[in-house]
């Protein structure tokens, strides 16, 4: 008789290929055989990071628009919205993490690979503006393939707009914490992902600009086994810490407590 649960679904682990029952992935979505971390949805990430019932979404009316008339983009947006239950690739709100208040922005790679576009840009701008207005720390959890090609230069301009707003945030005592999760690539890694006062990489995350396959097709080089990994970035001083997923919440809570900004501003 099989020792696996009788009901539920199975999935092949993207890394080791073993078949894993949905219950075996556990709360933190980790393969029990090779310890590969599944990519989380926004809902899963919020459940793991914030104090229960504390997340309050910011009011945001920005919606994606097919400004360039890109073929089939509108249909792809509708499909992504239907499959994820989101209307864009980032969710922003106020939250408590270990009883420490903050503004939290969480990107979702399940929505068109979490790509940066006009609507995502405006939401991140609003999150930073609210951090300044409410005198709260800002945490951005990145999960993105980069800029959204269907919005062309509009998506690229978003990189600079976000950097300009984060410069205004940096002129205040308010901290910016970036949490780099799998994947953090392209225009997101090239712009705001590494602008944090504290930069945390989730263990196992792939972080870089161009993907390894693109680089190897362009340059006749053999890339190291740990290329574009969280551990490699830590070894080279690009991130402040590599944290396992189960420890992320307590790590962020301790960091917020050390800064002491949100609690002092809100009693």
From Swiss-Prot:
The keyword rRNA-binding does not apply. Pathway: Lipid metabolism; malonyl-CoA biosynthesis; malonyl-CoA from acetyl-CoA: step 1/1. Gene3D superfamilies: 2-enoyl-CoA Hydratase, Chain A, domain 1. It is found in: Cytoplasm. Zn(2+) binds at residues 13, 16, 31, 34. Acetyl-CoA carboxylase is a heterohexamer composed of biotin carboxyl carrier protein (AccB), biotin carboxylase (AccC) and two subunits each of ACCase subunit alpha (AccA) and ACCase subunit beta (AccD). Component of the acetyl coenzyme A carboxylase (ACC) complex. Biotin carboxylase (BC) catalyzes the carboxylation of biotin on its carrier protein (BCCP) and then the CO(2) group is transferred by the transcarboxylase to acetyl-CoA to form malonyl-CoA. This is Acetyl-coenzyme A carboxylase carboxyl transferase subunit beta 1. The gene is accD1.
């Amino acid at each position: 008789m099989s020792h696996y649960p009788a009901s539920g679904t199975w999935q092949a682990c993207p890394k080791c290929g073993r078949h894993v029952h949905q219950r075996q992935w556990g709360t933190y979505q980790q393969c029990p055989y090779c310890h590969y971390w599944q990519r989380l949805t926004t809902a899963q990430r919020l459940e793991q990071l914030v104090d229960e019932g504390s997340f309050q979404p910011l009011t945001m009316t920005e919606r994606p628009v097919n400004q360039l008339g890109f073929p089939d983009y509108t249909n792809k947006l509708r499909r992504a919205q239907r499959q994820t239950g989101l209307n864009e690739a980032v969710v922003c709100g106020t939250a408590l993490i270990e009883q420490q208040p903050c503004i939290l922005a969480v990107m979702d790679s399940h929505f068109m690979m979490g790509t940066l576009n006009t609507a995502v840009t405006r939401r991140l701008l609003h999150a930073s503006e609210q951090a300044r207005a409410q005198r709260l720390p800002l945490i951005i959890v990145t999960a993105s393939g980069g800029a959204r090609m269907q919005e062309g230069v509009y998506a690229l301009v978003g990189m600079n707009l976000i950097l300009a707003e984060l410069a205004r945030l940096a002129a205040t005592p308010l901290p910016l914490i970036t949490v780099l999760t799998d994947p953090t690539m392209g225009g997101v890694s090239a712009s705001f992902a590494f602008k944090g006062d504290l930069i945390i990489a989730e263990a196992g995350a792939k972080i870089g600009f161009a993907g390894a396959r693109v680089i190897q097709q362009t340059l006749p080089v053999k890339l190291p086994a740990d290329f574009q990994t969280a551990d490699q970035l830590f070894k080279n001083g690009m991130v402040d810490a590599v944290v396992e997923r189960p420890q992320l919440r307590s790590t962020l809570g301790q960091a917020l407590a050390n800064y002491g900004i949100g609690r002092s501003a809100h009693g």
